[in-house]
Amino acid sequence: MEEQGHSEMEIIPSESHPHIQLLKSNRELLVTHIRNTQCLVDNLLKNDYFSAEDAEIVCACPTQPDKVRKILDLVQSKGEEVSEFFLYLLQQLADAYVDLRPWLLEIGFSPSLLTQSKVVVNTDPVSRYTQQLRHHLGRDSKFVLCYAQKEELLLEEIYMDTIMELVGFSNESLGSLNSLACLLDHTTGILNEQGETIFILGDAGVGKSMLLQRLQSLWATGRLDAGVKFFFHFRCRMFSCFKESDRLCLQDLLFKHYCYPERDPEEVFAFLLRFPHVALFTFDGLDELHSDLDLSRVPDSSCPWEPAHPLVLLANLLSGKLLKGASKLLTARTGIEVPRQFLRKKVLLRGFSPSHLRAYARRMFPERALQDRLLSQLEANPNLCSLCSVPLFCWIIFRCFQHFRAAFEGSPQLPDCTMTLTDVFLLVTEVHLNRMQPSSLVQRNTRSPVETLHAGRDTLCSLGQVAHRGMEKSLFVFTQEEVQASGLQERDMQLGFLRALPELGPGGDQQSYEFFHLTLQAFFTAFFLVLDDRVGTQELLRFFQEWMPPAGAATTSCYPPFLPFQCLQGSGPAREDLFKNKDHFQFTNLFLCGLLSKAKQKLLRHLVPAAALRRKRKALWAHLFSSLRGYLKSLPRVQVESFNQVQAMPTFIWMLRCIYETQSQKVGQLAARGICANYLKLTYCNACSADCSALSFVLHHFPKRLALDLDNNNLNDYGVRELQPCFSRLTVLRLSVNQITDGGVKVLSEELTKYKIVTYLGLYNNQITDVGARYVTKILDECKGLTHLKLGKNKITSEGGKYLALAVKNSKSISEVGMWGNQVGDEGAKAFAEALRNHPSLTTLSLASNGISTEGGKSLARALQQNTSLEILWLTQNELNDEVAESLAEMLKVNQTLKHLWLIQNQITAKGTAQLADALQSNTGITEICLNGNLIKPEEAKVYEDEKRIICF
């Protein structure tokens, strides 16, 4: 065998030579690669192998290589035990002596039990910094930020995962994520291998910041096993605090503005540059940057020592120009776009499902009786349930429930009427204003909401002033001077609505503040616009300027350009919908509509002069009506068969939300009249279950029958319940990709069978099981005009398949059934075969990807010999073989109606293909037989090049 050498010098195995000899023979290798001598000296002293005098001798050496040589001399002079311990140190302190890992593995060093019993103290700067970061993040992530500062809620006690979905570049679903650890998994959901950034998006309040806080906690406590040694967490809004002229190098950004190493920062930074893959960065809230930052057009800065503006450093970290290989997690609200070349994967947070909500109730209220009371009240009020699908709003409502329990002697009662988001925020404001009052052991606080808000008017005005000043500039962090200028007192700060930041501002010498959540800042901004009678019409309506037709909205921007990057605005094409990235304005408009609604006048007339209130209400309603009319007229329209279809944008969802906050039937009627179409398409609008309340509020005024397409949103079962007022008008209902379970299908069954007018029902890619399939069967049986049924990619097995097939068999109207991606198997296929036999109307059937094998396939083929209606049959991705191909060939000799037969990705060979091709000689009706992905070799497929109806590749 050829002898293998070492790059430095020949290695003498330790098992055949004393440890002293091993050190002597590899002396220059050790001198070259040992850079940290202090850690060695510390441990040799700790275990009494070195004396103080030995340590002084080492320290007196002028250069690092000299120190290493002196240590080696001293160690070897002290004998075999010390030499073995020296090697043990190199093995145990892996970060400090990372370059020696291959050598230690190659020599097969294995310490004795005596050596392993010795204490090793890790004073290596890199390891110390890792521990320092763990302590820092552990402290910051232990408690959840809470409204009331005197309360501290443990993250471990209240955190709960939400629905996490992997999505593609266009937000199409790629499947669910089951745990936070999967976020950093390098094998699932990868969109771009070259991308550096994992992008987490979701609506305000859906839990993006909490998710990052949970990740911090897991890493700090050693429960996130992802090979991460450095964890840097930044909130993007803090980058807005830097001045235009500020310049930092990467080391200063990480150390001076996050966590400074206790020892040898240069060595720590050098390790980070050399091994960037051991670092994890999280950047929370890209949408909260006070800049029209176009990440794809920021100047490159690939040198870690070159000073640059912090925003340039941020952009280059995300792109991988700086610290390429480090993991980066970036969060933003839905609507923010990040250049595709930056993205490694995208994750969409969808909030709480009904099962999440029940689990969260158990977490927040351990007492079973209390859980049952809360859940029964929520079930009785689907409007509240819908609000609770957003974790932040759920938490607020649950906190109010706790308050009612304490305030009303253990008999908590949530409101049983319709609640808007404005109601929720008014409620939490009232709760916390009351909690600041002195408590009495003998008398409950019985102040009315009017009295509570009147007593806290000055505090509300001061909070509103701070919020409004920030909102005008899209700023979310405030200096101490700005807070003091508003007149806020120390007792006001105890409410917890405005809180001190854990980190100091960029100057490092003054405290900064922020609102508990962006939605809270929007609420107090709206409150300020209502309370301050000096606010004129233009200022009142400022944030509505985005309610313009898409073509007009793209011409201006509320954001001042970020001066260092004039190219960020550029002269390129205008944005399609500038408003989509500015939810903080949208929430302000929403709360303004709620506060100025007729229902809130009794509450506000003691806070605002009557004349000012009338003036503001009049101005708001006039603007709301005209904006709504103009926007609806501008929406793109298209004629689809007998429908006049209008394609609405996400801005329309915000308009509906604002209309719902008014609770004005007049406004709802106006909106319904303005739609001027009988097919409303709201796909990919990121609508949640609470939005169904707003949609129903408008659509129940629609005078005619309507087609409604809500595919690819986030409605879940609560959203289906909220749509109940609309069902009497809906002929087309598309709810695919919406997290709907059997409970939601039950509601559909009950409601749609009341009116029996539905012709199209789309429920593709939900969470429907055999139980839900039976509810769909009822719809098929009783809705005699139903022509299209889409149930693909659910969880329906042969049992549910049999029920559905029987209903299809009995239907005289059904023309298209989609069952792709279920698991009906051979038994289900046989049932559908019976349905096909002599069916009068079914033209399209998809049983693709259903686990169908020989028996099921042959049954379908035999049935089609007695069918003259079916034109399209999809059997892609099953387990069909040549036996099935033979049966299908026999069928084709008889059936002249079938036009498209898809057998892609099955187990058919050249033999089965030949039989199908022969059958075409006597069939003039079929236009294609697709056999791509079967067991057919390219040379075998060449035989059929002239037969264009056989498609093999």
UniProtKB/Swiss-Prot annotation:
Its main location: membrane. Changing residue 788 to S: No effect on association with cell membrane. Reduced binding to gamma-D-glutamyl-meso-diaminopimelic acid (iE-DAP). Changing residue 877 to S: Does not associate with cell membrane. Signal peptide: none annotated. Pfam families: CARD, LRR_6, NACHT, NLRC4_HD2, NOD2_WH. One of its GO terms (cellular component) is basolateral plasma membrane. Keywords: Apoptosis, ATP-binding, Cell membrane, Cytoplasm, Immunity, Innate immunity, Leucine-rich repeat, Lipoprotein, Membrane, Nucleotide-binding, Palmitate, Repeat, Ubl conjugation. Changing residue 711 to S: Does not associate with cell membrane. ATP binds at residues 202-209. Changing residue 44 to A: Abolishes activation of NF-kappa-B. No effect on interaction with RIPK2. GO terms for molecular function: ATP binding; CARD domain binding; cysteine-type endopeptidase activator activity involved in apoptotic process; identical protein binding; pattern recognition receptor activity; peptidoglycan binding; protein homodimerization activity; protein-containing complex binding. It comes from the Eukaryota. Residues 15-105 form the CARD domain. Palmitoylated. Palmitoylation is required for proper recruitment to the bacterial entry site and hence for proper signaling upon cognate peptidoglycan detection. Ubiquitinated. 'Lys-48'-linked polyubiquitination by RNF34 promotes proteasomal degradation and thereby negatively regulates NOD1 for instance in NF-kappa-B activation. Pattern recognition receptor (PRR) that detects bacterial peptidoglycan fragments and other danger signals and thus participates in both innate and adaptive immune responses. Specifically recognizes and binds gamma-D-glutamyl-meso-diaminopimelic acid (iE-DAP), a dipeptide present in peptidoglycan of Gram-negative bacteria. Preferentially binds iE-DAP in tripeptide-containing muropeptides (MurNAc-TriDAP or TriDAP). Ligand binding triggers oligomerization that facilitates the binding and subsequent activation of the proximal adapter receptor-interacting RIPK2. The LRR repeats recognize and bind gamma-D-glutamyl-meso-diaminopimelic acid (iE-DAP). This is Nucleotide-binding oligomerization domain-containing protein 1. The gene is NOD1.
